[in-house]
Design a protein with these regions (language model features):
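Long, low-hydrophobicity, acidic/polar, solvent-exposed interaction domains
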Residues: 1-110
Length: 110
């Protein structure tokens, strides 16, 4: 896949997935954190594995519960990982539903 979607949530929780948005369920959301070993590592691994790394795109979707610092942090990761193709967009309803379901689970220890 040439894309990764990142969902920024409440309490600094961060999720990512790589599939068609219409098919996303809570079980598809992989939890990580804002560290170098967290989301940065995931972005780098997915970019290397992409069909065309020059077209690799990060789709950033902050929830209403995400804070401004998290947005700054994820934009910093775009710079650090050299991702020039990224977009900040709203969540679709099925992503909101998957996120709310996932938030019922304890925070992952990364």
């Amino acid at each position: 896949s040439n894309t990764i979607t990142i969902i920024m949530g409440k309490d600094n929780r961060l999720f990512w997935y790589q599939q068609a948005v219409a098919d996303v369920k809570a079980a598809d959301l992989n939890e990580t954190d804002y560290s170098a070993k967290g989301i940065r590592s995931e972005i780098q691994k997915k970019k290397i594995a992409a069909l065309d790394s020059s077209k690799f795109t990060v789709i950033i979707k902050p929830t209403d519960e995400a804070n401004f610092k998290n947005t700054v942090d994820i934009l910093d990761e775009m710079e650090i990982t050299g991702n020039k193709l990224f977009a900040l967009v709203d969540l679709q309803q099925n992503e909101v539903d998957a996120y709310k379901e996932k938030m019922k689970t304890p925070k992952a220890n990364n």
